[in-house]
Amino acid sequence: MKYDVTSHALGAHTLAVFRPRTEQPLPVLCLNAARSGDWDGYLPRLAADMGKTLRPAMLACVQPTDWNRDFSPWPAPALHPDSPPFAGQADARIDLLCDTVLPFLSARFPTLPGRAHTGILGYSLGGLAALYALYRRPDVFGMAGCLSGSLWYEGFLDFQRENIGCLSDARVYLSLGRKEERTRHPRMGRIGACYEETGSLLRISLGADNVALDLNPGGHSSDVDGRMLLGLRWLLSFT
């Protein structure tokens, strides 16, 4: 299916929109990425499936000003002595998506209304922020993709244990590289256990059919495009 990628100014922010060329209302997925160009490796393959084996969908990406600030849910210590601490301002970005970006898209383009057709996904810290957004705004998001997400983030498992009850009728795609837990860093080395518990919590709350946990070959940076494509395909197979 042919598509367009357009850029829109929203105050101080730049919004990139991937939209298949169709007049039918579309589901919307917000993408937590360092820049919209990160999708160049998989958009053509995704678009080729749309209208055939996959329902068309719109993707929206607002480039973050500061990755560690915009995708961290609350302040936390730095991973390394020479790195800045996490500033913890993901709430502001989530509100930007929910209260500005999504209304802008629905006013400008035909979109499918409701949380069942609205999702968010991301990779690494962006994946953590995507899953956090599902907890933070369950009134808006009904699906999330967390790929190699930073679920080792300080306090995040406790946050999930305390808030898992707020999730219902949602779908979650989880993905992790099999080698990611092979690290000497004490926090990042817990990623395998963090993913296992997260998957268990979500399956109990949402049902096994609504949660996918894929373990992929390689480490954190292995086949990012391919894994993003798998996550998008799984989420869009339900819309």
Regions found by a protein language model. Give the residues of each.
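Non-catalytic cap/lid and distal C-terminal segments of serine-dependent acyl enzymes
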Residues: M1-T239
